[in-house]
Amino acid sequence: SLYDIAPVTPGVAVDLSHIPTDVKIKGFSGEDATPALEGADVVLISAGVARKPGMDRSDLFNVNAGIVKNLVQQIAKTCPQACIGVITNPVNTTVAIAAEVLKKAGVYDKNKLFGVTTLDIIRSNTFVAELKGKSATEVEVPVIGGHSGVTILPLLSQIPGVSFSDQEVADLTKRIQNAGTEVVEAKAGGGSATLSMGQAAARFGLSLVRAMQGEKGVVECAYVEGDGHYAR
């Protein structure tokens, strides 16, 4: 199911339905997301305003926090057992809002709430592959710290068979942390990353489904609540 307040959403679903796959697609629009959420096992939230040049992710909080809160309230009522992936920026705070809404509704499960940071991983894979002359399919960079600028931390030392100088580590880390800004500035006010984010969201969602279906060894990085001293 696809859902957005925009009336174009059912038309997008029709467009997608013409692609020859086994997936059945329905589109829903309007203020009520309930019809799209009924029976859902996985919900990915990407709704919200996009960055413009000169903005950072935290500038989106005032608008996007309310959007996430509203959607998660509807999830808590309609499909409280669903796994939720939050893509909406700023991820490090919208995930916390989602957690508080779910706690208030009495349905919070930290093992089912994820801040989707896969975009940082695919960017890291691309940049490392370019630098080292490898195929991007050969590289998998674990990235921790969520998705808020300087908190994005690629673990470059954990890539098998690849080594870096201190300068390469510094340059790569900075580029990965600022890759979103690179896209925003290149689009000159026309929005932020959409196509690469779509690929990242699809990868994370499909990994989640594969794991839920019992496949072993499925590993993805995400922004989640831990078990340590600083866990919420």
Swiss-Prot record:
Binding site for NAD(+): D4, N64, I87, T88, N89, M197
Secretion signal span: none
Keyword entries, A-Z: NAD, Oxidoreductase, Tricarboxylic acid cycle
GO MF term (any one): L-malate dehydrogenase (NAD+) activity
GO cellular component, one term: cytoplasm
Keyword Cytoplasm: no
InterPro entries membership: Lactate/malate_DH_C, Lactate/malate_DH_N, Lactate_DH/Glyco_Ohase_4_C, Malate_DH_AS, Malate_DH_type1, NAD(P)-bd_dom_sf
Active site positions: H147 (proton acceptor)
GO aspect biological process, one term: tricarboxylic acid cycle
EC number: 1.1.1.37
Family, per entry: Belongs to the LDH/MDH superfamily. MDH type 1 family.
Protein name: Malate dehydrogenase
